[in-house]
Amino acid sequence: MNVKVYNLDGSEKGDIELPAVFETEYRPDLIKRAVISSLTAKLQPKGCDAFAGYRTSAKSIGKGHGKARVRRTAQGAGAFVPQAVGGRRAHPPKVEKILFERINRKERLKALASAIAASANPEIVSARGHKIEGVPSLPLVVNAEFESLAKTKEVLGVFTALKLDADLERAKDGVKIKAGRAKLRGRKYKKPKSVLVVVGDACDAVAASRNLAGVDVITANDLSAIHIAPGTMAGRLTLWTESAIEKLNGRF
């Protein structure tokens, strides 16, 4: 399958043949597992001190005194038990808890291939919430000169020429302050995802693009399901460079 390649001003440059990965079957179940696997891989096992709440001289006086048989200090205050001040926890976190979603290597690659193919389907991309009115084609491939852009203003000009600016505005307007404790824990804002830029190798465009609202930049070799299907939802609006398409040929 061939698609158009566009210059930085939005004009057509020519055609490029897409890798076979863009024809992969859509498997939302595999995509979800792969993304959850990537998310849970960041979790850290948690436990507590094995003697937490046990370090006390309190003891029970036994039955026959008309009071609960909990361990008590010399002053008569309850200790050791979960309902007592300074007592142990009833069900503390265990390091043995299984936190990670395991996935086979071939399944993970199949999920990535499926997510890449979904990013070329206008119905799936639109259903995810992206604004694609006026976008010349999906998948959207741009001239490799894009990777040499060093200014955010220049990148924004390319996005405007390719009609991607509407999706940037959607992401910018969608930034909201979260409710609850998240505000106190370094994740105050909910930030929608907009365009994913896939480049061939590390380049100037990486730093120039990532300051735009909702935009992420990744190299073709580092691309995974969590980038192209964030939140387990496939169909992210993606801008590919010519060199990124060539790298996909070698990866799949």
From Swiss-Prot:
<comment type="function">
    <text>One of the primary rRNA binding proteins, this protein initially binds near the 5'-end of the 23S rRNA. It is important during the early stages of 50S assembly. It makes multiple contacts with different domains of the 23S rRNA in the assembled 50S subunit and ribosome.</text>
</comment>
<dbReference type="InterPro" id="IPR002136">
    <property type="entry name" value="Ribosomal_uL4"/>
</dbReference>
<keyword id="KW-0694">RNA-binding</keyword>
<comment type="subunit">
    <text>Part of the 50S ribosomal subunit.</text>
</comment>
<keyword id="KW-0689">Ribosomal protein</keyword>
<dbReference type="InterPro" id="IPR023574">
    <property type="entry name" value="Ribosomal_uL4_dom_sf"/>
</dbReference>
<dbReference type="GO" id="GO:0006412">
    <property type="term" value="P:translation"/>
</dbReference>
<comment type="function">
    <text>Forms part of the polypeptide exit tunnel.</text>
</comment>
<dbReference type="GO" id="GO:0019843">
    <property type="term" value="F:rRNA binding"/>
</dbReference>
<keyword id="KW-0699">rRNA-binding</keyword>
<dbReference type="Pfam" id="PF00573">
    <property type="entry name" value="Ribosomal_L4"/>
</dbReference>
<dbReference type="GO" id="GO:0005840">
    <property type="term" value="C:ribosome"/>
</dbReference>
<dbReference type="InterPro" id="IPR013000">
    <property type="entry name" value="Ribosomal_uL4_euk/arc_CS"/>
</dbReference>
<comment type="similarity">
    <text>Belongs to the universal ribosomal protein uL4 family.</text>
</comment>
<dbReference type="GO" id="GO:0003735">
    <property type="term" value="F:structural constituent of ribosome"/>
</dbReference>
<dbReference type="GO" id="GO:1990904">
    <property type="term" value="C:ribonucleoprotein complex"/>
</dbReference>
<protein>
    <recommendedName>
        <fullName>Large ribosomal subunit protein uL4</fullName>
    </recommendedName>
</protein>
<keyword id="KW-0687">Ribonucleoprotein</keyword>
<dbReference type="InterPro" id="IPR019970">
    <property type="entry name" value="Ribosomall_uL4-arc"/>
</dbReference>
<dbReference type="InterPro" id="IPR045240">
    <property type="entry name" value="Ribosomal_uL4_euk/arch"/>
</dbReference>
